[in-house]
Amino acid sequence: MSENKRIGIASFDSGRGNTMKIIFPKVEEDCLSKYYRFNPKSYKGSKYSKYLNKFYKDRESWNAICPKIEEGRSFESYLKIDGLNTQEEKDVFAINKLNNDFFGIAIHHSGNGGLNTMKKIQNDHINGDNQRADISYHFGVSLSGEVLEGRPIGIKGAHLTKYNTGIIGIVFLADFKHDWWDVDDDMSKEALQSIITLIKALKEQFPNIGTLGGHKEWKNNTDRTCPGEYGLDYIKALRKELKLKSPKETGNG
């Protein structure tokens, strides 16, 4: 059997003298090469970035497919890294640029729709009703404590309504809206420790970040229930622990 991942075609002999071709979703290889991706090992990474790197999972680890970039699906890059050859060159250029753009972090939960993996969320965001170019969040945090790469950090997120510029999106792969009629999740020690490490690592590389809020706390998004009242209690505690302000305090709520 031969594969051509660049065009998403697999061909094989059917056993009857005929060659059959199957078109399948294109698994990532170089389709993100011109977009900047978060690098825990960058020159700006210090204590927390290095620790994060021990349990950080890139997109390839969860078999992400290439973004579906077409008219009507936003995939807006904050910067261009074309012509930069080494990872160090990309880090130096991108981190300086993105530090001027990033000011906040929005935290979400995946909710009760069964979308409890990055792969399921990406599939829903690309092929579901919203027809997005890629998974909307920049990072996912599992209850087991994994931190998973989502949308490249150099690409504007699609996780808030009309308020994504300068805001990094993180989703807990859990349901923190505790309703009596369905099965919900409790925060785990592992997930809490991991999101603290992730946020501290982001602050190391992008020190202008000063605002942290749940989905429903951001301007244009106050009608949302995400990340649930239970999840919001933890976000308030995270703000206190990390010495960050709420969207309302910084004029963004």
Residue ranges and their predicted role:
Residues H109-G111, F139, L143-G145, A174-F176, ...:
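Short, flexible loop/turn elements at secondary-structure junctions
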Residues G114-D134, G140, R151, D186-Q193:
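Glycan-recognition patch characteristic of GH18 chitinases/ENGases
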Residues E146-G157:
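Short, Gly/Ser/Thr-enriched beta-strand-loop segments that form substrate-interacting elements
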Residues S2-I105, P152, G166, D175-G253:
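Basic/polar, cationic surfaces and motifs that engage anionic cell-wall
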Residues I155-G169:
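Short, surface-exposed glycine/acidic/tryptophan-bearing loops
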Residues R132-S136, S142, Y163-I167:
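Short connector loops at helix/strand junctions that flank enzyme active sites
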Residues D91-A94, L98-D129:
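Active-site acidic/histidine clusters and adjacent loop/turn architecture
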